[in-house]
Amino acid sequence: VLTFSTAIAQKKKVAVVTFYANKMVEFNELGIGSEELIKDVLDLRDNPDFNLSPLLEQYHTNFFTDYAKAFPFDLLPEASVVDSEKYQNFEPKYDLNAYDAQNYLNYGNYKYVYEGILGKANEESIAKLFADEADGVLFVNIDFAFEKGFGVGKTMSIKMRATTRIALYNKKGEKVFAFNEN
């Protein structure tokens, strides 16, 4: 008698809890003091011609249709996360005031939830919020930075670099991985 035993490993599920672009362009690499450039960066942030919506829309589409396939886990349906009452009622620690909120462009119904060095309270509380449905939570954002280009004399070109940060936390709010990709 020949018997076969098949073990089916259930794929983990993850909730994407942030998806935003940071409109405050970093300028440290230019080597110019912040007092000279901060006004220009704020003017750029507030300029309606500096429209990051199409870029964020394209990144969102690519992320969910292409990039997500490379993850070793499945993503919960987006609407079940961002449109849920518990997500909409979630109030992150270090919530943004109206002035600081201008720095971020959230995609759709996503909220800005700080993740990082001082974000432990947010990471743990939002992970626990989805612990019944998901094995973890994913924070996704795009940052921009000016870089020095080619220069002669006192003139130079400036390039802009886009960097995405993707950070995964388990259902306890412990970091599994985080990476930045240009």
Predicted region positions:
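Short, solvent-exposed loop/turn and secondary-structure capping segments
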Residues: 27-28
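Bacterial Sec-dependent N-terminal signal peptides
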Residues: 1-12
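N-terminal segment of the mature soluble domain
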Residues: 31-139, 171-179
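Short N-terminal segments immediately surrounding and downstream of signal-peptide cleavage
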Residues: 10-24
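Amphipathic beta-strand/beta-sheet edge segments enriched in Tyr/Trp
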Residues: 136-139, 148-182
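Short alpha-helical segments and helix-capping/turn motifs at coil-helix boundaries
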Residues: 2, 122-125, 148-150
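Solvent-exposed loop/turn segments at secondary-structure junctions
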Residues: 21-23, 82-85, 144-147
